[in-house]
Amino acid sequence: LPFWASCTSKYKIEGTSSVNSLDGKMLYLKSLRDGEWVKLDSAEVVHGLFSMKGKIDSVQMVTLYMDEESIMPIVLESGKITVTISNTDLKAVGTSLNNALYEFISKRNQLEESIGELEQKETRMVLDGGDLDEIHGQLVVEGDSLMKAMNQYVKTFISDNYENVLGP
C-alpha cells in the first residue's frame, strides 16, 4: 500500500422507523469514553428515515440515543448498516458483527420468552385437570433445560467473540 493510504474505514447507517413519535427528532450515536457518553454522529428522523455516515479508526460498540434515552446498541464498523426501529423490534444488520449481535439478541429473547411461557403452561395444565405435583415436576425439568440452553448459548457467544467488541 502507498504510504499515504488511510487507516480509517467508512460506515454508513441507513435507518427506518415506524415509530411516529421519532419523526422530527434527532438521533445520536454515542460512545462511552472514560465514563462519559460522547456524541459521534447525529441525524434527524424525517418521514421515518434517517442516515449517518463517517469515518472510524477502529470497530467500536456505540449506542443509538434519542436525547438522553438509549434506544439500541450498534457495532460501528466499516460498511453499510441497516437499522430498523419499530414498536416491536430493534435491529441493526448488514455488517458481520451487527448481524451476529442481533442474531444473538433475537435467539436470547426467544429463550427468555419460552421460559416466561412456562407459568402460563402450568396454569393451562392445571385447568385441564392435571396433577399439580406432576405438572410442577415436568415444568421444573423444562425450565432447567431452557435455562441451561440459554446459559450455554450466552457462554458460547462470548467465547466465539472473545477477540472482538462483542466479547466480554
Set out the residue ranges of the language-model regions:
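A non-transmembrane, solvent-exposed segment enriched in polar/low-complexity residues
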Residues: C7-K155
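Sec-dependent bacterial lipoprotein signal peptides
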Residues: L1-A5
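Solenoid-like repeat scaffolds
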Residues: T156-D160
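Amphipathic alpha-helical repeat scaffolds of TPR domains
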Residues: Y162-P168
